[in-house]
């Protein structure tokens, strides 16, 4: 029995030890709070993970997971779900959670494109109170709220953010800093005032001056950049040069000794192809000079209703009813300049080179693939063309290694290191109009367009550019034929300044109140109709015959004091405006290529003479002249950001995809005369 008694006593003495071990083991398996690491940015996951953790947690830990889930949902583009979860946050938060909530409110505003609301919330945050990872997000929010508009505040935000970033993000930051600097005009840059201790900003502004002074001379630019890097060795941009300036340092000019010109020389598009050829060959033989800043011209012929334009698929013309239409002969008296041109700031010319070998290839006679093979065999150094859109799309599929200045652009632009796109299209003109109208401080535009595919394309291009510039909803209204417009005038109905949204805002991503915190999920009426403001700008795409009815109909319905400024495309200007028409159009602004605005009178006379005074064909002639200039500066357009040519079809610059943008001249009817818009 002794062994049995001993065993019971031993078991009794061991029981406390076993219980203690079990208790400590239980403590060891308890999951620690991991939310802090995620809050500090040392770990990351998706919203599904955070939502799961939130459901399994309580108290402060649950709130942390909820905040993390909101941040992830915003990042994933699930703004509506983020708003719903944001509104469920409790009122009682600790200091760290309150700071995170405030920052999330800003990020949600930005996701909803409520930039003014985001800026109001940012003004209430002191960045020094934030954790380091939150500071990087704060400065990013400041950057996003600027919508890419260059300013001293944007530059300061980028500079403050840079030390907080990793290597990959630093490169993006430096490129964004340079984008802001190079997007400024010299006039904007001259107005900047900085503090004495802002050494990094001072360095960036000195680099900007180097760029302004040398952007049209790649060799001088290279030397200027190298000197700047020596003077500012500690500037982030000197240590990691912006991508665009790296391209400048690697610049090599393209050869134009042997040029292949690809144009349609037969069929419906032949008249356009041959007109471009005329302009190109004229420039090759006599050279080009920078076109003067806009001067207004006052044509003296009477306005006449224009013939219906013919349609040729895929050809680009800025004034006509499709990407390819051109009108018939429209005789007009020679315009008379009424003001002197300003001095050009981008004095880039393309010298004559009569000895350059030029070979014309007819794209209407054989498949483009065969033509490109022949061009390579012939040893061309650069291709200019093709003109038709479907041929440009075939060109992209061919993956040609040749440098190409395409005279049109495909539906979907592809960034190719050897291709630039130069088109005269109604869409291109509409984008310029959006920029011009936005620059004039207008907020609520209406696009008045023909009931056609042309109208749809123009409306979409205008709205896309308007919203890219930070504008809101754009309205559209369509009109019918000239006979319908005439009937409207006779019936006294007029045209109301109302319309339907071209690109309505998504109903799931609406505004958030700027006070503490509830988020709307349905747009208000004001948001849906240009922030509740009346239409203050009307962009009209119409022929002279159509606009002769449209402008009086607007006045008939709205009165002369409607407050809306009227703008028109060059489609309304065909060189046939008589004194009565000019008086009727009083106050209306319209766009025109610089050559036909009087910026290059000798070439205008030469072009109009060559095309029997057809203004639409004169624009194509000017396109041929500018194609020569662009071909001679192909590498600069492709590689040197900000390189600019004051061309006959506009002030020419290239975007990162080497799509040539054209800034047009803007003119205005004033007391029976045509004057530059000041």
Swiss-Prot record:
<keyword id="KW-0133">Cell shape</keyword>
<feature type="region of interest" description="Disordered">
    <location>
        <begin position="302"/>
        <end position="340"/>
    </location>
</feature>
<dbReference type="GO" id="GO:0042597">
    <property type="term" value="C:periplasmic space"/>
</dbReference>
<dbReference type="InterPro" id="IPR008939">
    <property type="entry name" value="Lytic_TGlycosylase_superhlx_U"/>
</dbReference>
<feature type="compositionally biased region" description="Low complexity">
    <location>
        <begin position="513"/>
        <end position="528"/>
    </location>
</feature>
<dbReference type="InterPro" id="IPR007443">
    <property type="entry name" value="LpoA"/>
</dbReference>
<dbReference type="GO" id="GO:0004553">
    <property type="term" value="F:hydrolase activity, hydrolyzing O-glycosyl compounds"/>
</dbReference>
<dbReference type="GO" id="GO:0031241">
    <property type="term" value="C:periplasmic side of cell outer membrane"/>
</dbReference>
<feature type="region of interest" description="Disordered">
    <location>
        <begin position="496"/>
        <end position="528"/>
    </location>
</feature>
<dbReference type="Pfam" id="PF04348">
    <property type="entry name" value="LppC"/>
</dbReference>
<keyword id="KW-0564">Palmitate</keyword>
<comment type="subunit">
    <text>Interacts with PBP1a.</text>
</comment>
<keyword id="KW-0998">Cell outer membrane</keyword>
<keyword id="KW-0732">Signal</keyword>
<comment type="function">
    <text>Regulator of peptidoglycan synthesis that is essential for the function of penicillin-binding protein 1A (PBP1a).</text>
</comment>
<keyword id="KW-0449">Lipoprotein</keyword>
<feature type="signal peptide">
    <location>
        <begin position="1"/>
        <end position="26"/>
    </location>
</feature>
<keyword id="KW-0472">Membrane</keyword>
<feature type="lipid moiety-binding region" description="S-diacylglycerol cysteine">
    <location>
        <position position="27"/>
    </location>
</feature>
<protein>
    <recommendedName>
        <fullName>Penicillin-binding protein activator LpoA</fullName>
    </recommendedName>
</protein>
<dbReference type="InterPro" id="IPR011990">
    <property type="entry name" value="TPR-like_helical_dom_sf"/>
</dbReference>
<feature type="lipid moiety-binding region" description="N-palmitoyl cysteine">
    <location>
        <position position="27"/>
    </location>
</feature>
<keyword id="KW-0573">Peptidoglycan synthesis</keyword>
<feature type="compositionally biased region" description="Low complexity">
    <location>
        <begin position="330"/>
        <end position="340"/>
    </location>
</feature>
<dbReference type="GO" id="GO:0009252">
    <property type="term" value="P:peptidoglycan biosynthetic process"/>
</dbReference>
<dbReference type="GO" id="GO:0030234">
    <property type="term" value="F:enzyme regulator activity"/>
</dbReference>
<dbReference type="GO" id="GO:0008360">
    <property type="term" value="P:regulation of cell shape"/>
</dbReference>
<comment type="similarity">
    <text>Belongs to the LpoA family.</text>
</comment>
<dbReference type="InterPro" id="IPR028082">
    <property type="entry name" value="Peripla_BP_I"/>
</dbReference>
């Amino acid at each position: 029995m002794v062994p049995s008694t001993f065993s019971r006593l031993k078991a009794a003495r061991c029981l406390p030890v076993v219980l203690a071990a079990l208790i400590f083991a239980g403590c060891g398996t308890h999951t620690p709070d991991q939310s802090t690491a995620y809050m500090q940015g040392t770990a990351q996951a998706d919203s599904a993970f955070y939502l799961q953790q939130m459901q399994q947690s309580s108290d402060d830990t649950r709130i942390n997971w909820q905040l993390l889930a909101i941040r992830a949902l915003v990042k994933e583009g699930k703004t509506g779900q983020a708003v719903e979860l944001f509104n469920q946050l409790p009122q009682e938060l600790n200091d760290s959670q309150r700071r995170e909530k405030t920052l999330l409110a800003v990020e949600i505003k930005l996701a909803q494109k409520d930039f003014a609301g985001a800026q109001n919330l940012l003004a209430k945050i002191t960045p020094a109170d934030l954790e380091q990872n939150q500071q990087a997000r704060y400065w990013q929010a400041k950057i996003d709220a600027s919508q890419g508009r260059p300013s001293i505040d944007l530059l300061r935000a980028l500079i403050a953010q840079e030390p907080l970033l990793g290597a990959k993000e630093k490169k993006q930051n430096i490129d964004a800093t340079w984008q802001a600097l190079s997007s400024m005009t010299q006039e904007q840059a001259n107005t900047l005032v900085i503090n004495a201790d802002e050494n990094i900003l001072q360095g960036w502004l000195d680099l900007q001056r180097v760029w302004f002074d040398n952007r049209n001379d790649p060799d001088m630019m290279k030397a200027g950049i190298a000197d700047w890097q020596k003077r500012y060795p500690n500037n982030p941009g000197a240590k990691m040069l912006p991508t665009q300036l790296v391209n400048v340092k690697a610049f090599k000019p393209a050869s134009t000794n042997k040029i292949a010109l690809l144009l349609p020389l037969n069929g419906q598009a032949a008249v356009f192809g041959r007109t471009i050829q005329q302009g190109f060959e004229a420039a090759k033989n006599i050279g080009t000079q920078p076109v003067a800043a806009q001067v207004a011209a006052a044509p003296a012929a009477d306005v006449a209703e224009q013939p219906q334009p013919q349609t040729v698929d895929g050809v680009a013309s800025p004034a006509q009813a499709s990407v390819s239409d051109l009108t018939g002969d429209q005789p007009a008296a020679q315009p008379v300049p009424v003001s002197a041109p300003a001095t050009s700031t981008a004095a880039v010319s393309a010298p004559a080179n009569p000895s350059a070998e030029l070979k014309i290839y007819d794209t209407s006679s054989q498949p483009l693939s065969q033509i490109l093979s022949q061009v390579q065999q012939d040893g061309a150094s650069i291709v200019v063309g093709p003109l038709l859109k479907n041929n440009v799309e075939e060109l992209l599929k061919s993956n040609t290694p040749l440098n190409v200045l395409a005279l049109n652009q495909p539906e979907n632009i592809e960034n190719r290191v050897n291709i630039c796109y130069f088109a005269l299209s109604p869409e291109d003109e509409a984008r310029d109009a959006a920029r011009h109208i936005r620059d004039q401080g207008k907020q609520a535009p209406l696009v008045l367009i023909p009931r056609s595919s042309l109208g749809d394309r123009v409306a979409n291009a205008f709205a896309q550019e308007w919203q890219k510039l930070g504008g809101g909803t754009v309205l559209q209204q369509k009109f019918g034929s000239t006979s319908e417009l005439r009937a409207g005038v006779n019936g006294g109905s007029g045209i109301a300044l109302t319309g339907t949204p071209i690109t309505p805002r998504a109903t799931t991503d609406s505004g958030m109140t700027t006070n503490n915190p509830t988020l709307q999920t349905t747009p208000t009426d004001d948001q849906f109709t240009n922030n509740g403001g009346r239409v203050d700008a009307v962009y009209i795409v119409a022929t002279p015959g159509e606009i002769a009815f449209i402008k009086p109909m607007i006045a008939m319905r709205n009165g002369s004091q409607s407050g809306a400024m009227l703008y028109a495309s060059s489609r309304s200007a065909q060189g046939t405006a008589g004194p009565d028409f000019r008086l009727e159009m009083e106050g209306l602004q319209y766009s025109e290529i610089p050559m036909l605005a009087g910026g290059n009178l000798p070439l205008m006379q030469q072009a109009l003479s060559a095309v029997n005074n057809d203004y639409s064909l004169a624009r194509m002639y000017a396109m041929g002249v500018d194609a020569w200039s662009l071909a001679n500066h192909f590498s600069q357009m492709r590689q040197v950001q900000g390189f600019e040519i004051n061309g006959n079809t506009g002030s020419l610059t290239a975007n990162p995809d080497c799509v040539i943008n054209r800034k047009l001249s803007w003119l205005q009817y004033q007391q029976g005369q045509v004057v530059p818009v000041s």
